[in-house]
Structure formats: C-alpha cells, structure tokens
C-alpha cells in the first residue's frame, strides 16, 4: 500500500507559497499509506524534475518553484526493493521518444517478471515491481492515452497509476486501488488515494474554497488533465485486473469464504457500519475487516489497526497463514 497525491492548477490560481503549502499538506496527509520514502514530480519550463528521498513526507522540504502548475506525488510503503536505494522510490523517470515522463504506482503487481520475459525488457538495477510499467511505456515509444491503456491492460495485481509528462499532461489511471479526485470552480484539481486523506490535506489549506465537486473514476478509466485544464477520458481493458488476485489484493475473506461473513452482514450495528465506512474511506477492504472480526478482533482493535496499516496487514497475513496450516 502506497499513497498517490497531487494537483493540477491550469489557471495559475495559487501563488508559490500556497503551492508549497498544498504540496506539503497532501504529502503529509498521505503518510498514513507509507513512510519509507516520499517524492514528487513537476515541470519547470519544459524540463521534468523529480525530487524523492527515502524519508517520510513530514521530513521533506518541498521547495517547489514558482509558476508550477502540476504536482504528482507519492508516499511509499516498501513491498519490493529497498527504499534506502533511492532509484527504487517513486516517482520513476522514463522517456518515450522525445517525451520525458514520471510514473507513480500504488499497489502490487504480480506479473512483472512474466512481462519482462515476454517483452524482452532490459535488465535494470531498479528492484520494484512497479518499474515494469515504465519499461512497457518506453518500449511503446510514445506516451498517450492509447499506449498508457495498453500498458495498464497488461498488468495483473493491484494498481492505480499517475503519469506526468514534460508538457504538463497529467494522467490518472484508475485500476483496483483507490483514488479520489476533487475539482474546484477555479479549475484546480486535487487528488489523493482516499477521500479521508484528501479531506485532511485540504482542511489544512484555508486559502482553498470549500465548494468543490467529486470527479468520479471507475476501474478502467484513464483521466488526462491537459495543461489548459480540459479533461479527456478514455478506457483500458480490465480483463486482467482481477486475474490471479492474492489475499492482500482482493481481501483474504473472499479467499476463505467463512460462513460467519453472512452472520456479520446480517447483524451489522451502527458502530460496525461506521467502522466499515471508515475503513473503505481509508482504502482498506471491507472483507478484510470481516476477516479480523471473525478471528476475534473487536471493533476498537480494528479501529486502532486502521491507523497502523503495517500492523493491519500483518494481522491479516498471520490469520491467512494460520488457516493455510489448518
């Protein structure tokens, strides 16, 4: 689990001080999804810049230049590839023809090794599963909604992607990992992995208006935010999206289908409904909450675990492994 965050301000409504404040607020709020590393990509002139470090977001200094209109950010919880080796961290640089881009990923890919062999991708010292998406795009030779869709359609596992090119085109690719987007009347668009993160970040930015609308994306949607603020929507083939899902993608509960799931659903209380809503808003799966309930965790235990994602998924893992031994 990692955090995606960022914004597009095509009409230059934010002065430099507010740009930095918004960037820092989004990054710090996204820490709940990863503290191993943090990074952003932005465009200065027509030069793509990437600033990332193996540090939690609150320890970073976000020195974003004036006149920056797009920020694409990431907070990392390490699953593959040591975060101390900075090339393993997001966003990743890439190049398609004459176009440079940066890519960030939230999720876990299962078929990265298979894709490397199938498409004869070059060896690299970057050890993360995410980087295969960069290599596939580079092999296509151009960067647009079609080639991004082709790459997304080949991925198996869990993901949402964000991609920024040197011309300030920002692509938000919605797979089966969470992504929440708000649009303001000024044309400003802000996004984060979950609604709770986005609300927390924006609450720290009193200079932003309260009036906004949700931009809804479904699995398979690709939203391109152009430099002039126009939105272009396209789709990718989702037939591989839920192929060979593992317990940490689809929810361990579905893997085991215990009978008490129906019991819990029939006997939900107001407090449990609230817990489930909170979990979903934070990017957790309802089925994993039910699994922990069946294992004997009470609602207060689970509520505490939601604030410690590593401990939450650790509890899920222990439960699944124990059942595999039964």
Describe each PLM feature range.
Residues 1-326:
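Conserved short alpha-helical segments that host acidic/polar catalytic motifs at enzyme active sites
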